Amino acid sequence: MKLPIYLDYAATTPVDPRVAEKMMQHMTMDGVFGNPASRSHRYGWQAEEAVDVARNQVADLINADHREIVFTSGATESSNLAIKGIAHFYHKKGKHIITSKTEHKATLDTCRQLEREGYEVTYLVPDANGIIPMERLEAAMRDDTILVSIMHVNNEIGVIHDINAIGELCRSKGIFFHMDAAQSAGKIPIDVQTTKVDLISISGHKMYGPKGIGALYVRRKPRIRLESQMHGGGHERGMRSGTLATHQIVGLGEAAAVAKQDMAADSARITHLRDKLWNGIKHIEETYINGDMEQRYSGIFNVSFNFVEGESLMMALKDLAVSSGSACTSASLEPSYVLRALGLNDEMAHSSIRFSIGRFTTDEEIDHAIKTITESIDKLREMSPLWEMFKDGIDLEQVQWAHH
């Protein structure tokens, strides 16, 4: 067993060996290394063919048409292109956008930029379970609302939004629906034929593909128009210029094909391991799962251990690669904005750890994790005066702390 044990699959995944092998065939002189836009010789034709195969593989994963897939550098770029692209193209129709406070920074920061450009954004607050109620979403809709951007699976707490209901509501109001599927694509089924979603952000490195590659699904019927954010060459039907990274795209395509093939088996294994982990630590006093218990993806599991500092816990769990929030924000000592939006106080938000389980996690690793977590919590609480006061029956909410 390799230490530290990797339990941070929501931050990134290792490239599946089947994907890496396929990518290696598209990098060197002996492989298919040409520029897919080179139409005058075989090197270009072969590269274009490899890109076409990958485009079909990504489309198959979500039951889309291959012409609806636009390759990007990742889900962050996809979300930027989707949100800004819609806002800029349809600005005469309206300048109001709806999103939620628990979205990824790729969505939130893009919306903040649009606010600086004169757009209005409504940031919905979820219920304590992390889910946006449909009536709250509908109440926020206005005549000038052009876009709703809600993530499928939350990257910190793993809750799943009802995208079918959101899609139906948006379509009935003539509002475009963008979905950030960075954490869900390749892990839970997505079918664009039955779900009325117009734009989907997809990430390669969250589904055992390479970093630096992603895709944006752009619906053709009814047709969605975007204003390009990257100019120079008119690649990807004018939506995203730049030489196509053949080996990366092939990697994304193969990752999508493997994910589709292994999805049911992966899901069953990951659910088993998540249940095993929770059953092994739920006896620890003052331990709480964050987010809805039912409507969730089993691979992301966020737990608060009351009366323990998250940072000290992470130091104690040095044998486990885990995070105290999303990788994009765990470098900050601020409590998770996602957990704060759920109504958790600073102490509970600070004492939370995100465990994310993936394709290569083993039973042995989970056993070791349970032992490490249990021992670390006991040790840290032994040193905690707050824990001692709590055990003595003192209501810490009522304590008046002296300021120095």
Curated annotation (Swiss-Prot):
Subcellular location: Cytoplasm
Positions contributing to pyridoxal 5'-phosphate binding: A75, T76, N155, Q183, S203, G204, H205, T243
Keywords: 2Fe-2S, Cytoplasm, Iron, Iron-sulfur, Metal-binding, Pyridoxal phosphate, Transferase
E.C. code: 2.8.1.7
Reaction equation(s) it catalyzes: (sulfur carrier)-H + L-cysteine = (sulfur carrier)-SH + L-alanine
InterPro entries: Aminotrans_V_dom, Aminotrans_V_PyrdxlP_BS, Cys_deSase_IscS, Cysteine_dSase, PyrdxlP-dep_Trfase, PyrdxlP-dep_Trfase_major, PyrdxlP-dep_Trfase_small
Biological process according to GO: [2Fe-2S] cluster assembly
Cofactor: pyridoxal 5'-phosphate
GO terms, molecular function: 2 iron, 2 sulfur cluster binding; cysteine desulfurase activity; metal ion binding; pyridoxal phosphate binding
Main location: cytoplasm
Binding-site list for [2Fe-2S] cluster: C328
Enzyme class: transferase
Source superkingdom: Bacteria
Pathways per UniProt: Cofactor biosynthesis; iron-sulfur cluster biosynthesis
Residues at the active site: C328 (cysteine persulfide intermediate)
Subunit structure, interactors included: Homodimer. Forms a heterotetramer with IscU, interacts with other sulfur acceptors.
Record HAMAP family: Cys_desulf_IscS
Protein family membership: Belongs to the class-V pyridoxal-phosphate-dependent aminotransferase family. NifS/IscS subfamily.
Function of the molecule: Master enzyme that delivers sulfur to a number of partners involved in Fe-S cluster assembly, tRNA modification or cofactor biosynthesis. Catalyzes the removal of elemental sulfur atoms from cysteine to produce alanine. Functions as a sulfur delivery protein for Fe-S cluster synthesis onto IscU, an Fe-S scaffold assembly protein, as well as other S acceptor proteins.
The protein's name in its UniProt record: Cysteine desulfurase IscS
Organism (species): Shewanella frigidimarina (strain NCIMB 400)
Gene field: iscS
